[in-house]
Amino acid sequence: MTHSLRPPKNNEDKKAWVALGSKYEKEFVKLLGKLRIKAEINPQKKADPFAPDLLVEGRVAELKTRRTPFFKTAQYGISPDTATTINKKDIERYIKTNPGMVIFFWVYWPAQESYGVKVKECCGVWFARMDKLKKICDSAPVK
């Protein structure tokens, strides 16, 4: 279960983060299988580690797993209860190669407090097509 997966102690350890991401991808595929949604790790990832993460119902998909709230978003008028991020360079790369690709945000964190900010428990899976997400991000007040 993903509750036992822990982030690397060194935030700059890219190899450890990639390994953790691979574990989350496998767990997410299992979760979708329990929901009778056909999913697998993208076979292209063996040759290209930057290839999209998954194939879901035959469609290319990317997984973003979030396990920590962004407490400081409250300073920008964005609720930290559900705030997340995505790298602009990731969106630009995927728009060029597969604009209709789906991105899944798999989110879980318990209710907690940090930096004087309380957040509620957040648990769920949200998804959007990359081209739609780009439009949202292009018009976002925070870049």
Locations of the language-model features?
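Acidic carboxylate-rich catalytic motifs and surrounding loops in phosphoryl-/glycosyl-chemistry enzymes
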Residues: 41-49, 104-111
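Catalytic cores of nucleic-acid endonucleases
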Residues: 11-18, 64-114
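Structural alpha-beta junctions
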Residues: 34-38, 96-102, 134-135
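Conserved catalytic cores of phosphodiester-cleaving nucleases, focusing on short active-site segments
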Residues: 28, 32, 52-75
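Acidic-basic catalytic patches of nuclease active cores, encompassing PD-(D/E)XK
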Residues: 1-45
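A structural signal for short, well-ordered beta-strand segments and their strand-loop junctions
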Residues: 40, 55, 60-62, 102-107
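Non-catalytic C-terminal interaction segments of nucleic acid-processing enzymes
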Residues: 1-4, 23, 31, 106-143
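Short amphipathic alpha-helices and their capping/turn segments at secondary-structure boundaries
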Residues: 46-58, 93-94
